[in-house]
Amino acid sequence: MTTVLDPIRHRTILDDIDHICQTAGISQYFLANSMMDVCGPEEVEWVRHFPKNRAVSAGLVLTDGSNVSNRMMYMAGALIRNFTDARVFPINTVLRLAKTGELPTPTVMLIPNLYVKAGGSAKGLAHWDVQAIYDVLLERQAASKPTVLFIEDMDAVSQAYGNVFRDFLENNYKIVG
């Protein structure tokens, strides 16, 4: 693959690429390469039209688990190339940082494992952690800072996190398979 980073347009990114990638939670590979061959058309459209999409929804919920963490890293790379602060955080990191008041507030936060079935069960986070992540999502929505989430099964997330949580997602996020 040929890099999509332009040496002139992306000079500020290239000058600080190690720090930018470390902060974003992605490798340089995802920053330097296009998302086009890996991400689905709805994911590409969401990134391409980010300013418009940011104004009309709280973010994106991905339900197709195929290569989801890499897809999110490609999305973050594309957003960063367009000078948007995008960061990938596992759910446990989000919870740990939120509990200590140290959770960064990037323009776009991507969580590749908000809900993953554990051994086929519908058990998820402890109820206090569900409330903590719900708080994070509400605060990000109020600040117009979209969040991209992976949820393996919307029915199971309803059982594990409650109907109010699912209702919030369905009414405020674009859900794509």
Predicted region positions:
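Loop/turn-to-beta-strand initiation segments
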Residues: 57-58, 84-85, 105-109, 142-150
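A short, basic N-terminal segment
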Residues: 1-53
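Structural motif
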Residues: 61-67, 90-93, 112-115, 151-154
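AAA+/P-loop NTPase substrate/partner-engagement loops
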Residues: 78-118
